[in-house]
Amino acid sequence: MNVTLRAEVAADRDFLRRLIVETVTLELGAEAWPEPMRSHLLGIQYTARLHSRRVEYPGAVSHIVQADGADAGWAVVHTTRDEVRLVDIMVLPELRGKGIGAAVIAHICATAADRPFRLEVNLMNSGARRLYERLGFRITGQDDVQYLMEKLP
């Protein structure tokens, strides 16, 4: 599978909404929530996710992940003089487990050069944590919600 990154553009909003809503639905177990509550709360999650990434990491670059030319995910990367930080990464649920996330991480690692590459992963997301550990990240701390992970150059 050929995995590439391209810059996010305004025309990607429908794809991002679908991706974020599907991801959050799985994260929160929202499949069984009654409508219209489900749509309303997932819409709030979509807006909050986009807004918080832009406020917390001004200057971060949002990428659409493509697998064999089709939109497959989203990666937000914030680069400073001192570090490269993966702010967010999502892959469509039906495409998970196919190496797309690993390919994105490898690409970002290559751009990190001589800087540490840092990220956070939810304490409940053991699959992502194992992936990051396989790719050379180690846990450097944790809070009530997430592990802090780092890969040194």
Which positions does each model-derived feature cover?
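Conserved N-terminal entry element of GNAT/NAT acetyltransferase domains
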Residues: 1-14, 18, 153
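Conserved beta-strand positions that form and line the central face of beta-propeller blades
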Residues: 4-7, 64, 148
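Acetyl-CoA-dependent GNAT
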Residues: 10, 17-93, 105-107, 111, ...
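Structural preference for beta-strand elements that scaffold enzyme active sites
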Residues: 83, 116-118
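Conserved acetyl-CoA-binding loop-helix of GNAT-fold acetyltransferases
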Residues: 91, 97-110, 129-134
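Conserved beta-strand-loop-alpha-helix junction that forms the acyl-donor binding cleft
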Residues: 96, 118-129, 145-152
